[in-house]
Swiss-Prot record:
Residues 291-357 bind DNA. This is Probable WRKY transcription factor 31. It comes from Arabidopsis thaliana. It holds the Pfam family WRKY. Residues 168-177, 198-209, 226-236 have a biased composition (Basic and acidic residues). It comes from the Eukaryota. Residues 153-277, 517-538 are annotated as: Disordered. Transcription factor. Interacts specifically with the W box (5'-(T)TGAC[CT]-3'), a frequently occurring elicitor-responsive cis-acting element. It is found in: Nucleus. PANTHER family: WRKY TRANSCRIPTION FACTOR 31-RELATED (PTHR31429:SF106), WRKY TRANSCRIPTION FACTOR 36-RELATED (PTHR31429). One of its GO terms (molecular function) is sequence-specific DNA binding. One of its GO terms (cellular component) is nucleus. Its main location: nucleus. Keywords: DNA-binding, Nucleus, Transcription, Transcription regulation.
Length: 538
């Protein structure tokens, strides 16, 4: 920046006015800034020189090239750095010292600006470093959390696997204990094959339960449709195996003795005997009764798990399983008779492994005793099914040839209890020679007692039988009855044990029950009469 010292008037102007000579009259004094003082001085000097040459008596006022300090104090600083005095040369009027100062100041200013920018960049760099450090810290924390979660998940999975393994082992031990402690079911051959047969009869869903370690009830409730399909498939496969086995005689060496004797050695006979016994692993009890309902009421709780159409019968066959306890092996099939739609055929298979309610003991005891005695009579020889001298034939067939029949047309022995036949008047011998029918026609006979008596009679007679290679459950079925019925059953048991003929024993048992009931009714009537007489006397 350039500074021009300017004087706007003052004592110097007055002094100059006092010193004005006549030669300076042509100069005009103005109160303005004269920016051309140098030129004016040059012209004035030339004029003075000319005057000197002419008269040599001209007064010349010499102006100094520098402005006095006291005059400079009155100058106005306009910031232009201009000089009003002559520097004595033709050089630039810009002061070299001032220009150098300006350059230094400019450099300092730029340096200060650069320093400020550097400071800002340092601050920004520090902020970025802090952000990077925070991000690194967060990443490390998340990584540690992820590792901890993965370890917890692995520990949880390992603990679950360990628990599942323990549960499966416990389930296996329980099954082994059940194989040892629980009595064999009535469809097995003998006590020696209890463990092997139990292992062979384990269904697919039970094997799945052992692998997974889950209880059977959870698996059944989780997917009942799949369980029903599997069970239905098992029933169908068993029926197909029955039809295929009995359709081709070569598959059953029991009914082909020539093939077993053709070898003429002892090993072949042993193999044929084992095959024949394997054929008799299960027994089924079929009950025919007239009912309009979908199934007869036997006191148990059932769940339907399948249905299919059978050959030769337009009515579908329904499959049920007992749901009163988890893992109960009892199954039943319900189907209408093709010839008479009013007859409902119910086929039971298996034995309950849980306590039964009073309403279910009658049918369960009857079917269990019938199947057990059927197997006990069939194990004596290969012709045991067809031999009328076996225990069951001697027990039931003399009573009524139409009440119970034994089927040998299937690999599994089946006994059919026909409850639809009524006494026929055209055949008087059936009623005369049948003690069971005689007592069934007596007045006051209660049909609900018959299954209990038959079941208990079969049970006691089977205990006394020498043909039986079986053992019924150690815990007998619980028959919930009144005290009078219990006394009647005990009397029937004593009569059956003392009489070798089952028909006569059964007749004696029913007689004792009827007499006990009538005696109890007479006692009740006598007590009522005595009470009424006492009341009237009072």
């Amino acid at each position: 920046m350039f500074r021009f010292p300017v004087s706007l008037g003052g004592s110097r102007d007055e002094d100059r006015h006092d010193q004005i000579t006549p030669l300076d009259d042509h100069r005009v004094v103005v109160d303005e800034v004269d920016f051309f003082s140098e030129k004016r001085d040059r012209v004035s000097r030339e004029n003075i020189n000319d005057d000197d040459d002419e008269g040599n008596k001209v007064l010349i006022k010499m102006e100094g090239s520098r402005v006095e300090e006291n005059d400079r104090s009155r100058d106005v600083n306009i910031g232009l750095n201009l000089l009003t005095a002559n520097t004595g040369s033709d050089e630039s009027t810009v002061d070299d010292g001032l220009s150098m100062d300006m350059e230094d100041k400019r450099a300092k200013i730029e340096n200060a600006q650069l320093q400020e920018e550097l400071k800002k960049m340092k601050i920004e760099n520090q902020r970025l470093r802090d952000m990077l450090s925070q991000a690194t810290t967060n990443f490390n924390a998340l990584q540690m959390q992820l590792v901890a979660v993965m370890r917890q998940q692995e520990q949880r999975n390992s603990s679950q696997d360990h628990l599942l393994a323990q549960e499966s082992k416990a389930e296996g031990r329980k099954r082994q204990e059940l194989q040892i402690m629980v009595p064999r079911q009535f469809m097995d051959l003998g006590p020696s094959s209890g463990a092997a047969e139990h292992g062979a009869e384990v269904s697919s869903e039970e094997r799945t339960t052992v692998r997974s370690g889950s209880p059977p009830s959870l698996l059944e409730s989780s997917n009942p449709r799949e369980n029903g399909k599997r069970l239905l498939g098992r029933e169908e496969s068993s029926e197909e195996s029955e039809s295929n086995a009995w359709g081709n005689p070569n598959k059953v060496p029991k009914h082909n003795p020539s093939s077993s004797n053709s070898n003429g050695n002892r090993n072949g006979n042993v193999i044929d005997q084992s095959a024949a016994e394997a054929t008799m692993r299960k027994a089924r009890v079929s009950v025919r009764a007239r009912s309009e309902a979908a199934m007869i009421s036997d006191g148990c709780q059932w769940r339907k798990y399948g249905q299919k159409m059978a050959k030769g019968n337009p009515c579908p066959r329904a499959y049920y399983r007992c749901t009163m306890a988890g893992g109960c092996p009892v199954r039943k099939q319900v189907q209408r008779c093709a010839e008479d739609r009013s007859i409902l055929i119910t086929t039971y298979e298996g034995n309950h492994n849980h306590p039964l309610p009073p309403a279910a003991t009658a049918m369960a005891s009857t079917t269990t005793a019938a199947a057990s005695m059927l197997l006990s009579g069939s194990m004596s020889s290969q012709d045991g099914l067809m031999n009328p001298t076996n225990l069951l034939a001697r027990a039931i067939l003399p009573c009524s040839s139409s009440m119970a029949t034994i089927s040998a047309s299937a690999p599994f022995p089946t006994i059919t209890l026909d409850l639809t036949n009524s006494p026929n008047g055209n055949n008087p011998n059936m009623t005369t020679n049948n003690p069971l029918m005689q007592f069934a026609q007596r007045p006051g006979f209660n049909p609900a007692v018959l299954p209990q008596v038959v079941g208990q009679a079969m049970y006691n007679n089977q205990q006394q039988s020498k043909f039986s290679g079986l053992q019924l459950p150690a815990q007998p079925l619980q028959i919930a009855a009144t005290s009078s019925v219990a006394e009647s059953v005990s009397a029937a048991s004593a009569a059956i044990a003392s009489d070798p003929n089952f028909a006569a024993a059964l007749a004696a048992a029913i007689t004792s029950i009827m007499n006990g009931s009538s005696h109890q009714n007479n006692n009740t009537n006598n007590n009522n009469v005595a009470t009424s007489n006492n009341d009237s006397r009072q």
